[in-house]
């Protein structure tokens, strides 16, 4: 449904819909955001979309790097214990969530401008990539919390659980590699495979 809405040619309507579905939560304004707002306020729209899309590509790469760090640290907490706590992981998870909101808002604003079919496709892929990064980040956070609970109760993972975590770690890394390629602008990177990977992770964690 969301993809169909994005393809509608009614920019003003799309922006209202996007604002309605985005979380009603204050988002910190960064220097890059101020630059973006200035760019969008320009009356010279020629080339603005390309510049804005390139900026968002860079920010998505940063968001992906943060998620990759959380994946790595979460599995480290499982393997070595969470005796030092998981606050750093939680802080990065919040950063990922905020980045997702900020970038989603930026994309909705770009879509208000007249777009080429290529730009529309690029922006649609960006929405998909953002959602995938956030979901993998959620998996990492849940895993870290699980490891912390096990640590607090003085329990240990069974050999079977360790094998499952090893499979899950490899699956997460596979998904991150696909997202890395997609975030770099590889239009051939099959995002449908990322969805399948997320489903495999869900199956393991049930």
Per-region residue spans from a language model:
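Cytosolic, long alpha-helical scaffolding segments
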Residues: 1-206
């Amino acid at each position: 449904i969301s993809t169909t809405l994005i393809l509608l040619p009614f920019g003003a309507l799309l922006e209202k819909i996007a604002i309605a579905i985005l979380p009603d939560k204050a988002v910190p304004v960064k220097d890059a955001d101020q630059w973006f707002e200035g760019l969008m306020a320009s009356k010279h729209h020629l080339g603005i979309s390309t510049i804005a899309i390139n900026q968002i590509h860079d920010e998505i790469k940063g968001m992906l790097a943060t998620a990759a760090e959380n994946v790595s640290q979460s599995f480290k907490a499982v393997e070595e214990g969470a005796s030092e706590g998981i606050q750093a992981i939680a802080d990065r998870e919040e950063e990922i969530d905020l980045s997702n909101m900020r970038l989603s808002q930026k994309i909705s604003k770009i879509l208000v401008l007249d777009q080429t079919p290529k730009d529309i496709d690029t922006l649609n892929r960006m929405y998909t990539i953002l959602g995938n990064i956030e979901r993998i980040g959620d998996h990492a956070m849940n895993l870290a919390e699980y490891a912390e609970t096990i640590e607090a109760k003085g329990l240990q993972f069974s050999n079977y659980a360790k094998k499952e975590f090893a499979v899950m770690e490899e699956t997460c890394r596979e998904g991150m590699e696909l997202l890395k390629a997609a975030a770099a602008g590889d239009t051939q990177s099959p995002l449908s495979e990322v969805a399948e990977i997320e489903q495999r992770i869900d199956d393991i964690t049930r």
